[in-house]
A protein has these predicted regions:
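Acyl-donor binding region in acyl/amide transferases
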Residues: 110-212
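Residues that flank catalytic or metal-binding motifs in active/ligand-binding sites
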Residues: 83-85, 97, 202
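Short acidic (Asp/Glu) patches
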Residues: 68-76, 80-84, 109-121
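Charge-rich, low-complexity intrinsically disordered segments
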Residues: 200-269
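Short, His- and charge-rich active-site/binding loops that engage polyanionic ligands
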Residues: 88-122
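Secondary-structure boundary elements
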Residues: 48, 62, 91-93, 158-167
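Short acidic N-proximal helix/loop "leader" segments that mark the beginning
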Residues: 1-35, 251-279
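Short amphipathic alpha-helix that is part of the acyltransferase structural core
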Residues: 26-78, 86-88, 95
Length: 281
């Protein structure tokens, strides 16, 4: 269910900003980024992360996916750490939409809570995993929501490439699975089940063989959009680091202690060796 320290991708490296890297996106065909694409940013501060996860809480509570809590915030424990990157986009002065990307790490992935055997099977075959989760959108317009999702998935794909990962996994409601399959080439890797993290709502586990799919001549629309509009490694270099001192006294710390009995300061301290991102050559 968990990956060992020896399977980390960092090998004791420092953060992106302190390393000379070979940018994998230099190999990809380039085209101009569409001016109509909803803007996205990588969260660089505690305030931005908590604002994003407050939106997740608001939307998930409204949909009946989670119980209310006094911190008015929602986070999966596996998403808190230096292996994570919180992506968000603005809607006026507020966070309008968000998703969280988290690499496989010693705590495992959120989907391990229901698909540990299947994920362990992928790990044994050499897959290096990135989970996409905690998606939320403030807007009610379906067309605008799809545009934001395309934009955020572009960030997810390039985060996976820059961190030398092979697969992206995601758990979605059955009615959303076809979108990811048709627009990105995701495939089911295990049967649907109920998901305790969202009040036992149904979940379909999907897997994108990232590098295999990108090597094909013809790509699904979403994957082609990400390929043709690359992001540099520097886009992630100042992401919020989830250092113990940054989390101390935060809403994140309070929520994780109250809900899961986890002290993120202590957990983050034990994971300091995983600070860096291993970039592909």
């Amino acid at each position: 269910m968990k990956v060992s320290d020896s399977s980390k991708t960092s090998s004791g490296q420092e953060g992106l900003q302190s390393k000379t890297v070979v940018d994998i996106t230099a190999r990809l065909p380039r085209s101009g980024v569409r001016s109509s694409e909803p803007p996205c940013l990588c969260a660089t501060s505690l305030e931005q992360v908590e604002s994003a996860w407050r939106l997740v809480y608001q939307r998930y509570s409204q949909m009946g996916l989670i119980d209310e809590n006094r911190f008015a915030i929602h986070a999966a424990p596996a998403a808190v750490g230096q292996h994570a990157s919180v992506i968000w986009g603005p809607e006026g002065p507020e966070v309008g939409y968000t998703m969280t990307l988290f690499r496989d790490n010693p705590m495992g992935l959120a989907l391990d809570s229901v698909y540990a055997r299947s994920l362990d099977g992928l790990r044994r075959k050499g897959s290096r995993l990135l989970e996409v989760g905690m998606l939320a959108d403030r807007r009610q317009s379906a067309s605008r929501g799809v545009g934001a999702l395309f934009s955020m998935m572009r960030w997810a794909i390039h985060y996976g490439l820059h961190t030398d990962l092979t697969d992206i996994v995601i758990g979605v409601h059955p009615r959303h699975a076809q979108f990811y399959e048709r627009c990105y080439g995701f495939q089911k890797f295990a049967p649907p089940t109920s998901y305790p993290l969202v009040r036992n709502h149904p979940v379909v586990p999907l897997r994108l063989r990232l590098r295999e799919e990108l090597a094909k001549d013809e790509l699904p629309r979403g994957l082609a959009d990400a390929r043709d509009n690359p992001l540099p490694a520097s886009a992630f270099s100042h992401r919020f680091a989830f250092e113990p001192e940054q989390l101390r006294g935060s809403l994140i710390e309070g929520f994780l202690k109250d809900r899961y009995g986890i002290d993120p300061g202590r957990e983050a301290a034990s994971g300091r060796a995983d600070r860096g991102l291993a970039l592909s050559a």
